[in-house]
């Protein structure tokens, strides 16, 4: 139903004659919320831990895919709310990006691709979904190319994405030549997996993982994050990661533990050490995302890893949205002497923010401590679940690497917080405008979820035990 809802939205926005993007976004938000609530009731009534396939087993529906659908919808609601907030402030919107109707359509197409990736039960469906997601992202990043660097980053995204798509397509074609099938179920009929088949699945897994910018092929994606408007950065740094990692966790095609272990360790170390050298906010958060991708990659080594993955991706998504919302809201208070809105590019632009809005700095502290993994915040339980899972499966060296990477990455998280509580070194003029009350409520809700995670942690575990065995 969620997939059909996105298709209907794409049709509506494409054919709509409304010229006011604010009206379109209001309708989209209301529609997404209603569909999400209705689909939740339908799930509780009918699905209830059952697995179904449709369209000749091309798509799969179960508890795992439904949860990821809800998470993607939730993220889209928050981002579209930020987009609406952007439209309501004429002086501020140019700082973020000038809104265009085409962008709304591209976002919806990208969401459709993400949902299809998660539900793919066939390699042909997977490839079509990946290309649907990839080409929409190419266009999303290309729309606002106002500089040479931005244009270069967009072309790099297209070039690297094309190469990885070729690798994925070649792997799928070779898989078919070996098994005469495009489904993973064909593996069940084999008594012994051949070396060729292992290499095929490794190549397919690498193509998918490099799509989300894991090390060592990470620089191109970080360049994209740096040179796109911040609202687009929030989206492309989260949704593709969720869809592809969710598919890998559900399908369990990453069968070679050695390759995944090496890439996960490399991603953890590059993400944690690389972040120490950054002075730009979006690059720092990009390396943070790389480190978190490394954490989630470790779960590909394990069987029955759905609970740990869903818990971690949920708390990471909440923290990711919260920290970017804090950065966006800071634009209201980091107003330079000419009273012009300026994008926050460097970390030191946040210097003295505590004197302008202590609540934002308190919120930042909570999110930063959650990223570090300080108990009893939500991020602590996410990392604890992963650590205990890999320890229970005998990956002791990787556990040590995880702890070391967490300690190193804590340094640049604390650097971000430390700058915001220092004395101001420039003359600031506070804005007369205020943050939208709706967005204030959204940010407050995210902070509450992060802060009081220990209260409902046992409830979350009970729910997962019921619906995910």
Curated annotation (Swiss-Prot):
Protein name as catalogued: NADH-ubiquinone oxidoreductase chain 2
Catalytic reaction list: a ubiquinone + NADH + 5 H(+)(in) = a ubiquinol + NAD(+) + 4 H(+)(out)
Membership in a protein family: Belongs to the complex I subunit 2 family.
A Pfam family recorded for this sequence: Proton_antipo_M
Organism of provenance: Yarrowia lipolytica (strain CLIB 122 / E 150)
Record bears the keyword Transport: yes
Function description: Core subunit of the mitochondrial membrane respiratory chain NADH dehydrogenase (Complex I) that is believed to belong to the minimal assembly required for catalysis. Complex I functions in the transfer of electrons from NADH to the respiratory chain. The immediate electron acceptor for the enzyme is believed to be ubiquinone.
Organism superkingdom: Eukaryota
A single Gene Ontology CC term: mitochondrial inner membrane
């Amino acid at each position: 139903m969620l997939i059909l809802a996105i298709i209907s939205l794409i049709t509506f926005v494409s054919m709509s004659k409304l010229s006011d993007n604010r009206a379109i976004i209001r309708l989209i938000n209301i529609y997404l919320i209603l569909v999400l609530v209705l689909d939740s009731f339908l799930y509780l009534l009918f699905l209830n831990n059952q697995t179904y396939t449709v369209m000749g087993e091309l798509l799969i529906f179960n508890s795992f895919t439904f949860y990821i659908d809800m998470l993607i919808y939730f993220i889209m609601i928050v981002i579209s709310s930020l987009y609406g907030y952007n439209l309501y402030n004429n002086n501020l919107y140019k700082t973020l990006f000038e809104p265009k109707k085409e962008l709304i359509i591209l976002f919806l197409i990208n969401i459709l691709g993400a949902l299809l990736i998660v539900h793919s039960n066939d390699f042909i469906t997977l490839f079509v979904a990946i290309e649907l997601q990839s080409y929409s992202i190419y266009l999303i990043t290309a729309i606002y190319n106002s500089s040479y660097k931005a244009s270069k980053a967009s072309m790099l995204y297209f070039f690297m994405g094309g190469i990885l798509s070729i690798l994925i397509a070649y792997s799928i074609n070779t898989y078919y030549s070996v098994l005469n099938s495009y489904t993973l179920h064909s593996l069940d009929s084999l008594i012994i997996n051949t070396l060729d088949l292992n290499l095929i699945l490794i190549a397919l897994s690498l193509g998918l993982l490099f799509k989300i910018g894991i090390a060592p092929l990470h620089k191109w994606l970080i360049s994209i994050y740096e040179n796109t408007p911040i609202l687009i950065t929030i989206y492309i740094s989260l949704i593709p990661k969720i869809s592809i990692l969710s598919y890998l966790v559900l399908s369990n095609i990453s069968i070679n533990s050695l390759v995944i272990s090496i890439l996960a360790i490399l991603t953890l170390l590059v993400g944690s050490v690389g972040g120490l050298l950054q002075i730009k906010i979006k690059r720092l958060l990009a390396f943070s995302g790389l480190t978190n991708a490394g954490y989630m990659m470790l779960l590909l080594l394990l069987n029955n890893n759905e609970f740990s993955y869903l818990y971690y991706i949920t708390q990471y998504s909440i923290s990711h949205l919260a920290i970017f919302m804090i950065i966006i809201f800071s634009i209201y208070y980091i107003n330079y002497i000419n009273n012009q809105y300026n994008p926050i590019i460097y970390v030191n632009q946040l210097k003295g923010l505590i004197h302008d809005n202590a609540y934002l700095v308190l919120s930042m502290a909570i999110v930063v401590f959650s990223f570090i993994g300080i108990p009893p915040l939500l991020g602590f339980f996410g990392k604890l679940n992963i650590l205990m899972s890999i320890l229970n499966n005998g990956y002791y060296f990787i556990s040590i690497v995880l702890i070391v990477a967490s300690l190193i990455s804590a340094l640049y998280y604390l650097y971000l917080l430390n700058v915001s509580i220092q004395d101001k070194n420039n003359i600031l003029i506070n804005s007369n405008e205020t943050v939208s009350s709706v967005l204030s409520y959204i940010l407050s809700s995210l902070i509450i979820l992060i802060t009081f995670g220990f209260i409902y942690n046992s409830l979350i575990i009970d729910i997962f035990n019921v619906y995910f065995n």
